[in-house]
């Protein structure tokens, strides 16, 4: 220190002097701390969140300056000063959604209440009390959970010898976890996953799965919030007819080509070894130089043949793969595996009196089971379908009401004059379509259907080996409906009328 300079107290002594000066002016100094919840506060999206904070020790905070803020003190989430809330310094996104709970403010207990919680409200909050020169605060975390919509699962079509399945959902926060699994709980690897955020910060997910194992049957799409135990899931059935079936002649062709390639490879290897021997002999005997040239030409010829065969094989593979993909989209490919049913269709509506007065000669010509319903317009030239695969087509272009499919006897009880019949049919009534499975008065299943194109001709495929009955719209060659994995108890018969069944939950067929 220089001589003559006034003595200056050390900086460490200034704070106690200021406190003593303030004590002398005000007469008292406020000492306190602020406490808040130790664990994060978790609320659902769109509900109400309450963030409490408490002075310790307990004392009145009515005359204090209280501020809740996020990253920066200004602008604030909410400011309480001079006994009222100060809206002019509030963040715009919180206006009209916040209020201070102050019933216990005289004991130093207040809370910030946020209504209609949004995804942007998620994060850290600070509760600050200021009394004169004393200011203390506490931090707390608000976790917002958004449970999105139920998954939408559908098949997008065949791809690479399998079926691609797509699962989508929206309204999640934070980013959800998406999994595929089979009915046994085994996890399946997703082919692709896309997650995007909308303007409100909510996540939309879209994942796809390529199923090549036809034994799986069902797959389940499960979506779960990482901070919430509850999950939302949706299962989808993968029908066997949608999987591509391997043609024996194609397998034989591929095997033959592979064997040919192996043989060519063996021939090429033998030629290469012989070529090496010739090269050693040429070094010893120069007179055999011409023979070496001929051998090289032969080798090039064989290699060219092999390359040509490989190119032709690749071209055929590409053509077969393209044809197979196209075949899956049309019912015609199924006709290659099914035999045409020996049926006869009478497109004129039979008269009741004429039906009752049919001669025995006509009955002998039809050779139809006596249990066939009276108004059936389609007859089979045998006693029911034998075990196998059959298809037939029905023209329905001039009919506003019709029912077609198959039926079988439910019972062979001799005491019943009219044996019970089980129907699996497709029905049209006006503009409405539905698939029905019923026996007598009992409707086993009813499925309303939406068809983009009105069918003028319908093809029915009966597969007794795989227990499958499928209907195709031959107008646009699209699949309508399938009764899958439902066993046939007896010999089925074809069925077609120009009327709807008129069935409800209590009606009798």
Curated annotation (Swiss-Prot):
One GO cellular component term noted in the UniProt record for this chain: cell surface
Classification via CDD domains: IgV_MOG_like
GO biological process, one term: extrathymic T cell selection
Source species, domain of life: Eukaryota
This protein's UniProt keywords: Disulfide bond, Immunoglobulin domain, Membrane, Repeat, Signal, Transmembrane, Transmembrane helix
Topology in the lipid bilayer: Single-pass type I membrane protein
Segments crossing the lipid bilayer: 251-271
Extracellular side: 28-250
Domain B30.2/SPRY, first and last residues per copy: 316-509
Record carries keyword Cytoplasm: no
Signal peptide as annotated in the record: 1-27
Feature: compositional bias, Basic and acidic residues: 351-366
Broad class of the protein's primary localization: membrane
Name of the featured protein: Butyrophilin-like protein 1
One Pfam match: C2-set_3
Cytoplasmic side: 272-509
Disordered: annotated span: 349-372
Cystine residue pairs: 53-127, 167-221
């Amino acid at each position: 220190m220089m001589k003559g300079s006034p003595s200056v107290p050390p900086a460490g002594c200034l704070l106690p002097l200021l406190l003593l000066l303030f004590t002398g002016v005000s007469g008292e100094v406020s000492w306190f701390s602020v406490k808040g919840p130790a664990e994060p506060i978790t609320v659902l999206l769109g509900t109400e969140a309450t963030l409490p904070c408490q002075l310790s020790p307990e004392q009145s905070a009515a005359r204090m300056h209280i501020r809740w803020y996020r990253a920066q003190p200004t602008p604030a989430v909410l400011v309480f000063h001079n006994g009222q809330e100060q809206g002019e310094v509030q963040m715009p996104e919180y206006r009209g959604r916040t209020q201070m709970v102050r019933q216990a403010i005289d004991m130093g207990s207040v809370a910030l209440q946020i209504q209609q919680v949004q995804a942007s409200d998620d994060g850290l909050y600070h509760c600050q009390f200021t009394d004169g020169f004393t200011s203390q605060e506490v931090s707390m975390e608000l976790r917002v959970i958004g449970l999105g919509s139920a998954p939408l699962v559908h098949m997008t079509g065949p791809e690479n010898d399998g079926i691609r399945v797509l699962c989508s959902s929206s309204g999640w926060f934070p980013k959800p976890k998406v999994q595929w699994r089979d009915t046994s709980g085994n996890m399946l690897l997703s082919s692709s996953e896309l997650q995007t955020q909308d303007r409100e910060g909510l996540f939309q997910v879209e994942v796809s799965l390529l199923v090549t194992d036809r034994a799986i049957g069902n797959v389940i799409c499960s979506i779960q919030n990482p901070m919430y135990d509850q999950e939302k899931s949706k299962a989808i059935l993968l029908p066997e007819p949608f999987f591509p079936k391997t043609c024996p002649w194609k397998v034989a062709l591929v095997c033959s080509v592979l064997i040919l390639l192996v043989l060519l490879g063996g021939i090429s290897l033998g030629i290469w070894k012989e070529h090496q021997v010739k090269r050693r002999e040429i070094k010893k005997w120069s007179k055999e130089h011409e023979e070496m040239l001929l051998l090289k030409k032969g080798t090039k010829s064989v290699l060219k043949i092999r390359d040509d065969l490989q190119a032709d094989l690749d071209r055929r593979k590409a053509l077969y793969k393209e044809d197979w993909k196209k075949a899956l989209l049309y019912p015609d490919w199924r006709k290659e595996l099914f035999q045409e049913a020996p049926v006869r269709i009478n497109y004129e509506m039979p008269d009741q009196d004429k039906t009752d007065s049919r001669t025995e000669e006509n009955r002998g010509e039809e050779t139809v089971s006596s249990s066939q319903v009276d108004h059936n317009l389609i007859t089979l030239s045998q006693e029911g379908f034998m075990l196998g695969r059959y298809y037939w087509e029905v023209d329905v272009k001039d009919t506003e009401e019709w029912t077609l499919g198959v039926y079988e006897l439910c019972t062979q009880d001799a005491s019943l004059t009219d044996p019970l019949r089980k129907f699996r049919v497709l029905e049209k009534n006006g503009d409405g379509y539905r698939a029905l499975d019923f026996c007598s008065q009992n409707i086993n299943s009813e499925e309303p259907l939406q068809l983009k194109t009105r069918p003028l001709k319908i093809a029915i495929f009966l597969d007794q080996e795989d227990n499958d009955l499928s209907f195709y719209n031959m107008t646009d060659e699209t699949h309508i409906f399938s009764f899958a994995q439902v066993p046939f108890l007896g010999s089925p018969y074809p069925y077609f009328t120009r009327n709807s069944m008129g069935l409800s939950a209590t009606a009798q067929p």
